Amino acid sequence: MQAIWLNNYPAGVSKTLDLDPAETLLDFFESSTTAWSDRPAFHNLGHTLSYADIDHLSQQFAAYLQDSLGLERGDRVAIMMPNLLQYPVALFGCLRAGMVVVNVNPLYTARELEHQLVDSGAKALIVYAGSAHVYAEIKHATAIEHVLVTEPGDLLPLVKRLLVNFVVRYVRKMIPKYAIGSAVPFRAILKARMSAYRRPEKLTGKDLAILQYTGGTTGLAKGAMLSNSNLLANVTQVNGWFGGRDVPGKEIIITALPLYHVYALTVNCLSYFEKGALNILITDPRDTKGLIKEMSRWPFTALTGVNTLFQSLVRHPDFAALDFSTLKVVSAGGMALQADTAREWQRVTGTQVIEGYGLSETSPVVSSNPLDLPEYNGSIGMPFPETNVSIRDENGVEVALGVAGELCVSGPQVMLGYWNKPEATAEVMTADGFFETGDLATMDEKGYLRIVGRKKDMIIVGGFNVYPDEVENVVTEHPDVLEAACIGVPDDDGDDDEVVKLFVVVREGSAVTPEQLRAWCKENMAAYKVPKKVEFRTELPKSNVGKVLRRELRDEQVAG
């Protein structure tokens, strides 16, 4: 498409970027730790590691992988832990050794973990003790040769370390029993000889850095191959877009999203690392009271999150008492931002949530609204610099402005392909080099994009296309509604047509009826889009980052 968005970029955002294809994440890390050596880098559980600490510990970790474990450049190393100080140490240690990081969700079941470890061919696993029992169930089915087990307090000072680990294991009983005979404590890395570290030679930007597995919404998760250049390009894009308000070396970002999720990995861990920022790592963001208490200790300047995180914060009675005077950047992604959430956030904090869009396959950020957005607009913003988009119909033909079609993306942040899946890669890459996202979108005359639904979630009612996102956005505007999701189900009249079924979570004390919700919909959308069936729920199925899982609702309907 013609890049009409370039003419509407906010002041200070360059239309082009100076990207060095030879630069690696190792170069990036070394320059950042040198520049910000004495600055605090990561804080968790009451303890802070400086950039110099991260430099030292990650080199020890790299040396341990190379010397003690005998791993080689290109070997895959899986990291399975929540936000702890050990995560950046392990991440950067692997990258400094020239190895490939496989990010693993610590909430995975044995089946999910087995698939990811087998598919990636990982040789080593660094696992949080609370998840070790899951690995123990499937250890003989994988190619894992080395296991390092970490407990929450492993990088804390002695007294605090012993106390935290004791409380987690014996008081809160958060560490189920497990049997992994060859497991090594994470703190073994502290005995590694620094002199044993060997900086990998001839690393290039094209080299694979991370296997970021997709959410598996359409079957088994696939490993998106993200190169050094992919990730560094996105870091440059993110900092070029949001950097105008930043003061290098002075920023404090609240990292409530898990670092194993590509959104937090690129934006919080990498982009803010380059700026010398302090990352406040939140181990359990579902503990809203604890999250707010931690936020109260810091003059935080930035926060990333998803809709459900922002909802839980603004609805908590303690949140409004926080000091928001230093808050400059609030970025949302991972799922659609609801209008009522955005407006309530602005009312309480005086800041605007800036919604963006991305995928695992794009490192992840593709687009964002400008920082000076005056109010919520329902858009995912404009494509980033050096990013091209094309909205195409089912025949691959580009559609006109305002017409819905599949969002296709090209740019330096687009993955190399899916790990060991050339056929799956070919299915999503077009002949002219675009990645087919599977999301349906429109573009307006200024270049702003709007997601109207997933291609596979689209509901066809009487020959008309109904996009779940649109219906859900209308329903969540109702004052009695907290959350909503809709899917297509067979009509009861026995023909092959679909109808819209709505699942709703209402506010406490609400007496709203299905008929009232349908009447609300009739006032705000065409008749064929109005849900024919309405079901009230106490909660909706969600992913670990709070994204509503429509596929589980569909599976329930099929199962009867």
Model-assigned labels for residue ranges:
Residues 108, 115, 411, 416-417, ...:
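AMP-binding/adenylate-forming catalytic core of the ANL superfamily
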Residues 38-72, 78-84, 88-92, 109-114:
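Conserved AMP-binding/adenylate-forming core of the ANL superfamily
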Residues 7, 136-205:
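ANL superfamily adenylate-forming
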Residues 232-252, 262-302, 316:
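Conserved AMP-binding/adenylation subdomain of ANL enzymes
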Residues 166, 277, 300-304, 314-375, ...:
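Gly/Ser/Thr-rich phosphate-binding loop
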Residues 382-386, 397-428, 466:
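Conserved ATP/PPi-binding loop(s) of AMP-dependent carboxylate-activating enzymes
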Residues 3-7, 27-50:
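AMP-dependent adenylate-forming
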Residues 68-72, 193-206, 211-255, 277:
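Conserved adenylate-forming
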